[in-house]
Amino acid sequence: MGTIADDILGDLHGRILKTLDQLRTDLSAVRTGRASLHLLDNVRVDYYGTPTPLNQVATMSVPEARLIVVKPWEKSMIPPIEKAIREANLGLNPMSDKDLVRVPIPALTEERRKEIVKQVKHKGEEHKIAVRNVRREAKELIEVAEKDGDISGDDAEKALEKMQKETDDGVKKIDEIVAAKEKDVLQV
């Protein structure tokens, strides 16, 4: 196959991997009923007037399955940290305790678990669409290259077959990631 087709396939592969990474990142912030530091990834604390990521003003740990402990580097940050976690709409109720903030993770109700599973499936569908859009763009590039005479018809056909396999593999991987997250959410 020609280098143009190889370049297009390489780009397709890279973009599919980025989509899979983005899905993993998106799903890591979804509550499962167990404590995870990723739950607080998007929490911004007012640090002397500047919205600052929580992990830049405190040390965080998960000492128990349903508890996150946030230990600020400055004691004066305890009230703003509590406020930021409360206002992040994560359904969490932080409590200050001397020089740290305890964030108990409430158990999820069956109804809430089903709601979260729907969100997880929706995220999976969004990322499948992204993979298919990447394939469509790559297919158009292959067709233009063939039309312009940059690659032969046989090479274009081989590239399209590889492209379809790459896309199918990406979609299958998305299904696996979503299924694993669903299992995690439904596990009591």
Curated annotation (Swiss-Prot):
The answer to whether UniProt assigns keyword Cytoplasm to this entry is yes
Q: Which of UniProt's keywords are assigned here? A: Cytoplasm, Protein biosynthesis
Q: Which HAMAP family match?
A: RRF (MF_00040)
Protein name, please? Ribosome-recycling factor
The intrachain disulfides are none
Known role: Responsible for the release of ribosomes from messenger RNA at the termination of protein biosynthesis. May increase the efficiency of translation by recycling ribosomes from one round of translation to another.
Localization in the cell: Cytoplasm
Tell me where on the tree of life, at the top rank, the source sits: Bacteria
Q: Which GO terms describe its biological process?
A: cytoplasmic translational termination
Q: What SUPFAM superfamilies does the database record attribute to this sequence?
A: Ribosome recycling factor, RRF (SSF55194)
The entry's family comment says: Belongs to the RRF family.
InterPro entries, alphabetized? Ribosome_recyc_fac, Ribosome_recyc_fac_dom, RRF_sf
> A GO molecular-function term, please?
ribosomal large subunit binding
**Gene that specifies this protein:** frr
Is Transcription regulation set as a keyword in this record? Answer: no
Q: Which GO terms describe its cellular component?
A: cytosol
